Amino acid sequence: MAVVPDVSAILGQALDDEDATFAESVIAAIAHDEAIVPALFWYEIRNVLVMAERRKRIAAARTTAFLSDLALLPFSVDDLPREASVLALARRRSLTVYDATYLELAQRHDVPLATLDQALMAAARKEGVALFKPSARKADTR
């Protein structure tokens, strides 16, 4: 089954001080099927990694290698989030528009959302969107 990962879900694969176990499970799920992401995902991940470089959390060479590895995975970019739905989710669940975009994608495609963001997880639960479970690549709607 496809998954909608946000950046927090896979950062652990690049940054030593993030959750590597969860990230490895998400990346394995993507490799097995596919990830559906908004176009902003690629800008967001690059920004987070460059900021991490500035804070000496990652070397530039590691950023380049990580992005190259990600490019080999089956990512499907959904360029057309439904603006009205995204804005409604952001307002209703007090999310950033960025986070609401990931939630809207998971909701519309009826696939699990992979995130470590607690507010986004809570919003997904309230909206009835399944969350990615690393243990068996299953979803949890609790």
How should these model regions be labeled?
Residues A39-W42, R62-R93:
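Acidic catalytic patch
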Residues I30-D33, M51-R55, L70-P74, L89, ...:
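Alpha-helix C-capping/helix-to-loop hinge sites
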Residues A2, L95, L103-R142:
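Acidic, PIN/NYN-like endoribonuclease modules and their adjacent C-terminal/linker elements
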Residues K56-S68, A119-K126:
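Membrane-interacting alpha-helical segments
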Residues M1-L40, A52-A61, E127, D140-T141:
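Short, well-structured N-terminal submotif of metal-dependent ribonuclease cores
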